[in-house]
Amino acid sequence: PEISEADLAEMVERRRASGSRASHDLAFELTQPHIASPDVHVDEDNQQIIMYYHGLEGPGFQHSRVANSSDGINFVAGRENIGRTYIRAFKHEQKTYALAMPGQFYRSEDGFTNFEEGPRLFVPNMRHSAVIVRDNYLYVFWTRVGDAPESIMLSTIDLRPDWTKWQESEETIVLRPERDWEGANAPVEPSVRSTAYGYVKQLRDPTLYVEDGVVYMLYAVAGESGIALARVDF
């Protein structure tokens, strides 16, 4: 995106003053175009695949959109800005709800348009999350920037009250770096925002995948050095 050197320098300085730490140059972080973090759902009733994703709209400004496809290859993207980044969507009481980073909830009647902003839960340094609904409870797998080591945690939310009264439970660690390929032998250091360079003692980016009723979790290991698969038993 186009931005003057003076405006970019001012934006970088504001981020630094706020205490933001990133793993690379902040100017790069604020201006690098990208499409990322797909959240994909198979809509059997309407024979379509729905994908939520985010990208860079302008300097320092990212947001999410939604696209749909009949074959999983060719997608038609909507133009509406539906919310913050790293959206994870779920169905509840005939509506589509979404959890974005950091802890911001939205909902929509059709899952494509007019997303209403709701409560914000969790903590400001929440990173990415993965969600699944079981018996009126939302299970949220998530990680927290700054933890040493960053690990995958689980919190639950009772969905029965009005969403303005939702509250997350205290987190429980479900996965931490314990194997060599998970970064177990790297130094224990607090994690930072953005890309993880090299072999670090961190687990990140949980994503849930359901097949034949079995729930699996994919997650990033040793920072972002690989992807592992675990089975989730409820």
Describe the predicted segments one by one.
Residues 1-201, 210-234:
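Beta-rich carbohydrate-recognition and catalytic domains
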